[in-house]
């Protein structure tokens, strides 16, 4: 993850559902929703789930991308887990094909995408 901890696909099996949010540092709508996503993660944790962020500027361990992402997360009060991976993995190829940000997907315990991706910011005021 962005904090230097090892992560593998077992993180999905630990959760009833994992919400994965793809974002990047220069995306204003992405950064604007970081604090709301942190609130969503707290709600999900109470229901056996987790929200995970994937900043596409951190792929392959891009140090400057990671440093900037960590600053943005801290400035927005977002402490939920953010991970990166190599761009030549299945997840890396998926991230590389995203054309609209933020994009959010649901992952089941087996690491499968459930339903269609949600494009755009998450509005939690309607819940």
Region locations from a protein language model:
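Short active-site neighborhood of thiol/selenol oxidoreductases, capturing the structured segment around
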Residues: 8-31, 37, 50-55
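Structural microenvironment flanking redox-active thiols in thiol-disulfide oxidoreductases
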Residues: 31-75, 87-92
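Short, internal strand/loop/helix patches
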Residues: 67-105, 109-110, 118
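Hydrophobic "anchor" residues
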Residues: 6, 112-113
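A short acidic/small-residue loop/turn micro-motif
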Residues: 14, 120-123
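N-terminal "domain-start" segment that seeds a small globular fold
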Residues: 1-9
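Loop/turn elements at helix/coil->beta-strand transitions in domains of secreted/extracellular proteins
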Residues: 14-18, 45-52, 76-81, 109-112
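Short hydrophobic alpha-helix segments
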Residues: 10, 115-118
């Amino acid at each position: 993850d962005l904090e230097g901890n090892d992560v593998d696909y077992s993180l999905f099996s630990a959760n009833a559902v994992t919400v994965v949010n793809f974002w990047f540092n220069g995306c204003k709508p992405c950064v604007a929703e970081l604090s709301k996503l942190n609130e969503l993660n707290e709600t999900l944790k109470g229901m056996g789930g987790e929200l995970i962020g994937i900043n596409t500027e951190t792929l392959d361990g891009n140090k400057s991308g990671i440093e900037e992402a960590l600053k943005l997360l801290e400035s927005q009060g977002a402490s939920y887990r953010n991970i990166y991976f190599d761009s030549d993995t299945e997840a890396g190829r998926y991230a590389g094909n995203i054309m609209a940000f933020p994009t959010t997907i649901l992952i089941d315990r087996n690491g499968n995408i459930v339903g269609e991706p949600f494009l755009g910011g998450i509005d939690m005021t309607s819940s």
